Amino acid sequence: MMGCWILNEGLSTILVLSWLGINFYLFIDTFYWYEEEESFHYTRVILGSTLAWARASALCLNFNCMLILIPVSRNLISFIRGTSICCRGPWRRQLDKNLRFHKLVAYGIAVNATIHIVAHFFNLERYHWSQSEEAQGLLAALSKLGNTPNESYLNPVRTFPTNTTTELLRTIAGVTGLVISLALVLIMTSSTEFIRQASYELFWYTHHVFIVFFLSLAIHGTGRIVRGQTQDSLSLHNITFCRDRYAEWQTVAQCPVPQFSGKEPSAWKWILGPVVLYACERIIRFWRFQQEVVITKVVSHPSGVLELHMKKRGFKMAPGQYILVQCPAISSLEWHPFTLTSAPQEDFFSVHIRAAGDWTAALLEAFGAEGQALQEPWSLPRLAVDGPFGTALTDVFHYPVCVCVAAGIGVTPFAALLKSIWYKCSEAQTPLKLSKVYFYWICRDARAFEWFADLLLSLETRMSEQGKTHFLSYHIFLTGWDENQALHIALHWDENTDVITGLKQKTFYGRPNWNNEFKQIAYNHPSSSIGVFFCGPKALSRTLQKMCHLYSSADPRGVHFYYNKESF
């Protein structure tokens, strides 16, 4: 079992542990450096260990902010995916977990930002208290430095008769830190699954606060509020000898007044590369936005699904890819992802859109799919398309046997795949590694996806005509029905075609017994590498992942299930 788990999750776990290890190393190394570095000895007298907590978390923040944009650089990921020479097997599957890594890094940013904020609140209070009459001895002497000419200050809070909020808003670090914190809270809270499903538009717009976040981060350290003793001062001022003789600093030659300077800002050095890379992503998107998209066909399905056929010069796709669509008439900023439902062999590319939010509802209305007459081609709203971008499903043809599982709306990515399989099977001269496909479709109401049932019916007919019915084995499971449907199904059970879908393969009612299904597939294909591809809810994803671990053989010559989850 452990060997099978390593087969699917080993590399992912190594990468996550490496990320954690780098974070821990950076934090611990920086923490102890600031705890022991001689140039920050007097700073520690005022701030104590919270100096090290603030600086260590700041470095980890910089590291994670450097990483956060890379997983969402779609063109970069698609380029790496297309370069199969340097990206094969398990490494290739890691690209499909880009959003998971993006979220993981975001949690790292949130944790380190919290530590950084709390530590600096303590630092600010310590700076403020050090200017009070209660502060005595070396602490008071250090806080008074900078009050006379030719002295540099250590304590940025210059007077006690003030409050910490005022002092916070007087500094570049304070203002930008506040902006960074607010931006981070907005981004994190609007990224919850509930918000994304209830209002994708809110998620989309608030996520663009990242521009403010990165700008503020780049200038956050320019105020140089955390100060340490200069190297020239250290060579003249022996801390071990002079720290207890602070009253004699101006009179004893061996103890000149220590001089301090702020640390140079470094955050911009960490984020410059990824920001430039992401800026290139946006430039490419703008360039594609300018390209003309011709809408060749609009189909309004009875189930409330809008099918759009489009053409665009130079557009090349692979089955399973997706595009980003913008409709300037609805919003000039929003781009929404849709899986391509056409095959590469067709002379157009298509998407199927179901109303699932304000933007999609407005799009269906604009195209006349909400009970209105369909628009004339010349009056259709303009669409812009960015992509296509690769996903896990593009790797289907790398396996001899594939298990494809779709749940609900997750069936959409498999439309292009099944079409492409048909075209490849029809072309005798095309070498095809894939020899068997098991397709499972689980839905609550098949009528909501009539267009897909029609596609399956067409494929079934064509496969039968070509004598290749063995190539595709499909299983449809209906999880929701009422008494009238049950009675209707029972009355027509003996007919040659299914009463719900019209297919020769009868619909099952309930949910699959995945243990039985995987056991049978493993029995049918011993010593095979089987790709399992899924698009749907998380609960079912965990079940399928478990099945892949359970039924993969520890023997290298046995059957192996490789799990791939669709995400975009």
Swiss-Prot record:
Activated by the ototoxic drug cisplatin. Activated by NOXO1. Cooperatively activated by NCF1 and NCF2 or NOXA1 in a phorbol 12-myristate 13-acetate (PMA)-dependent manner. Inhibited by diphenyleneiodonium chloride. It comes from Homo sapiens. Residues 55-284 form the Ferric oxidoreductase domain. It is an enzyme of class 1 (oxidoreductase). The chain crosses the membrane at residues 14-34, 52-72, 104-124, 168-188, 202-222, 396-416. GO terms for cellular component: cytoplasm; extracellular exosome; NADPH oxidase complex; plasma membrane. Its cofactor is heme. This is NADPH oxidase 3. NADPH oxidase that catalyzes the generation of superoxide from molecular oxygen utilizing NADPH as an electron donor, upon formation of a complex with CYBA/p22phox. Plays a role in the biogenesis of otoconia/otolith, which are crystalline structures of the inner ear involved in the perception of gravity. The keyword Transmembrane helix applies.
